[in-house]
Regions:
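Conserved glycine-rich cofactor-binding loop
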Residues: 14-15
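Conserved glycine-rich Rossmann-like NAD(P)H-binding loop of the short-chain dehydrogenase/reductase
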Residues: 28-44
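Short C-terminal tail/terminal secondary-structure segment
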Residues: 93-96, 227, 238-253
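Substrate-binding pocket helix/loop in short-chain dehydrogenase/reductase
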Residues: 97-99, 103-111, 207
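Active-site helix of classical SDR
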Residues: 122, 159, 167
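Alpha-helical segment proximal to the catalytic Tyr-Lys
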Residues: 127, 172-173, 235
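Short, small/polar-rich loop/turn modules that mediate ligand/substrate recognition or access, typified
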Residues: 175, 180, 237-239
Length: 253
């Protein structure tokens, strides 16, 4: 098991990539503290893990609040004795408006969820990792804002581009203390954030065609990439923006 006796926080864990990662990390021996806003769905994920013999506790809340980030760390320490890493996966897409039509409050909301929350969670998690002798932080980014973008993605692209810069800063500042930090950049993934692709076959076909593999990822596939970054298999990997995008970034046909 790649994460035997490790303790991880996973945010955005009520569905999609976060829920898949929660299941996968637990199957690989980790105790997981699960965060998300949707209390019922989050409890369902935690209950499923426990029923399968794993260790999981849910703590619902809003990642844009500094106190919540601190509470997640405190729960990891009180329930499982410490913290070895986190998959900071919570995210928000936005409404798809063009830049000139985007209300300032939407800009603020998207950046608060995708970028500011990453800083808040890192601030809370880093001292716990240093006290443990190091660990791994993973942040969900996107190919959007890194290698490509689409119309209507201004807020999202800016937030995800900024996230890569934050990850690099964390990697440089805390590497000597044993902390690794990486961004994981998925391509199109069949989650609620995929919008029409989840329910509209024509939209799904179009989005699949943007990828070299000509399909959309399953959440479990992205979770496997997160597991790699979380584990000692990636012991010399830090400060990266690792694409798991099915060739989206290179595909022009």
């Amino acid at each position: 098991m790649l994460l035997k006796d490790k303790v991880f926080i996973i945010t955005g864990a009520s569905s999609g990539i976060g829920a898949a990662a929660a299941d996968l990390f637990a199957r690989n021996g980790a105790a997981v503290v699960l965060g998300a806003r949707r209390e019922r769905e989050l409890a369902t994920v935690a209950d499923r893990i426990v029923a399968s013999g794993g260790r999981a506790v849910p703590l619902p809340g809003d990642v844009t609040e500094a106190g919540y980030a601190e509470a997640l760390v405190a729960r990891a320490q009180s329930e499982f004795g410490g913290l070895d890493g986190a998959f900071n996966n919570a995210g928000r897409l936005g409404s798809g408006r063009m830049v000139a039509e985007t209300p300032p409050e939407e800009w603020a909301e998207v950046l608060a969820t995708n970028l500011t929350s990453a800083c808040l969670t890192a601030r809370a998690q880093l001292p716990a990792l240093v006290a443990r002798g190091g660990g791994s932080l993973i942040f969900t980014g996107s190919f959007i804002g890194h290698t490509a973008t689409l119309p209507g993605m201004g807020c999202y692209a800016a937030s995800k581009a900024g996230l890569v810069g934050l990850v690099q800063a964390i990697a440089v500042e805390y590497g000597a203390q044993g902390v690794r930090a990486n961004a994981l950049l998925p391509g199109g993934t069949m989650t609620a954030m995929a919008g029409d692709a989840a329910t509209n076959p024509d939209a799904a076909t179009f989005i699949a065609g943007l990828h070299a593999l000509k399909r959309i990822a399953r959440p479990e596939e992205i979770a496997k990439a997160a597991l790699f970054l979380a584990s000692d298999m990636a012991s010399f990997v830090t400060g990266t923006a690792m694409l798991a995008d099915g060739g989206n970034s290179i595909c022009k046909v």
